Amino acid sequence: MLLLINVILTLWVSCANGQVKPCDFPDIKHGGLFHENMRRPYFPVAVGKYYSYYCDEHFETPSGSYWDYIHCTQNGWSPAVPCLRKCYFPYLENGYNQNYGRKFVQGNSTEVACHPGYGLPKAQTTVTCTEKGWSPTPRCIRVRTCSKSDIEIENGFISESSSIYILNKEIQYKCKPGYATADGNSSGSITCLQNGWSAQPICINSSEKCGPPPPISNGDTTSFLLKVYVPQSRVEYQCQPYYELQGSNYVTCSNGEWSEPPRCIHPCIITEENMNKNNIKLKGRSDRKYYAKTGDTIEFMCKLGYNANTSILSFQAVCREGIVEYPRCE
């Protein structure tokens, strides 16, 4: 008992003098100290102390043995993870078994090679040995495949010899001379996805492609512009606030040209200044500034103390492409 008190006092004095922190009793996950019940009363211990420990079944020390030594260092116990999981690679049905029976240690990863048409869940290609075992479990399951016969390509060809492609497989195609992809390149690629091929290959005559669609005043396209558009591509336009779109919202690429773009018609801006000049105000409204679209009817009335100086019909003015004729009161 006296020896234990001396050890504790020595450690306390060392800490008080700014020396390194001692080590508490080690918590060895999936293992433990040999004779730990006998050793526990002597903790904490000084830097430099070491003890033999063991690992549970399915675990091993970093040196690969059943037991080893754990050391108290300035940074704590070393090794920090005394017991590591052992994972043995299982036999793979529908896969290649070059790793069958091989041991991997916690933190190690390895690639899994499955037969064509098979793969790991979620299209993964590697598995990792973790504290709880393999993640994901090494098994080759039937996966989505894409057939070369489902590809329709005009004015181009696919040079690959395979007829079946696994999920996420990308293949290249080339266009014949005088033809190009939608991006203007001589070749492109498509990918096998869960619902089939990502797209059908496109090889179009260079003369049939369109450049960016024409700009319009007081409006813009609703999508980012491309450098090249394939035939029958459509682009949508929209106008700035208060402007009215006249014509079709869309233009279409055909024979290398775009269809007629729409126009954005100016609104009529009814200002307090113009109304004061004519001694009028908006009927039933108190706006100091009012926007009206082409075709809208704007109703005016005379200010208090003034009488109409123009026809009664003029007080129901119609907005025509940004122009409105104001009535007048005297």
Swiss-Prot record:
Stored SMART domains: CCP
PROSITE patterns the record matches: SUSHI (PS50923)
GO cellular component, one term: extracellular space
Glycosylated residues (UniProt): 108, 185, 205, 309
Keyword Repeat: yes
Protein location: Secreted
GO molecular function, a single term: complement component C3b binding
GO terms of biological process kind: complement activation
Alphabetical keyword list: Disulfide bond, Glycoprotein, Hemolytic uremic syndrome, Repeat, Secreted, Signal, Sushi
Cross-referenced InterPro entries: ComplSys_Reg/VirEntry_Med, Sushi/SCR/CCP_sf, Sushi_SCR_CCP_dom
Ranges of residues in domain Sushi: 22-84, 85-142, 144-205, 208-266, 267-330
Bridged cysteine pairs (disulfide): 23-72, 55-83, 87-129, 114-140, 146-192, 175-203, 210-253, 239-264, 268-319, 302-329
Protein name (Swiss-Prot/TrEMBL): Complement factor H-related protein 3
Lineage: Eukaryota, Metazoa, Chordata, Craniata, Vertebrata
